[in-house]
Amino acid sequence: MKIYVDADACPVKDVIIFEATKAEIPVTLVTSFSHYSNAEQPIGVETIYVDSGADAADYRIMQLAQKEDLIITQDYGLASLALAKGCIVLHHKGYKYTNDNIEQLLQTRYLSAMVRKSGKRTKGPKPFTAEDKEKFRALFKSFIVR
């Protein structure tokens, strides 16, 4: 198993790196050049930089990921593609994407886009909390400690 992180706006990178390093599982952070950092990463953690295009990180993750790899993303489109490839996909708020819930998530995203297109406003996501972070940590550990 390898871990791929859609890292541009991922608030749990520290949890992923800490827990995966402890379990000796390789992590690849995929992020745009606009988030470039000289920060040194622990052994087993690689950062791949991609162009700042809308889905560049998603495409790169899909090129790299194999069946049963673990993907962390908040992007429903990437989650859908990764599920179809046989990957395990987690959201940073601590839930697992499944074939049962992805259709509903994509439908909700589409309907919200249509509402915005008509000139109306929609609610954004709730703020990320410490409770969300711990929920993610527990779920993440359940997949890497086997």
Curated annotation (Swiss-Prot):
Report the record's disulfide bonds. Answer: none
Output the Pfam families linked to this UniProt entry.
DUF188
* Family annotation (HAMAP family): UPF0178
Q: Which PANTHER family match?
A: UPF0178 PROTEIN YAII
Give the protein family. Belongs to the UPF0178 family.
Name of protein: UPF0178 protein BCQ_2874
Q: What is the originating organism of this protein? A: Bacillus cereus (strain Q1)
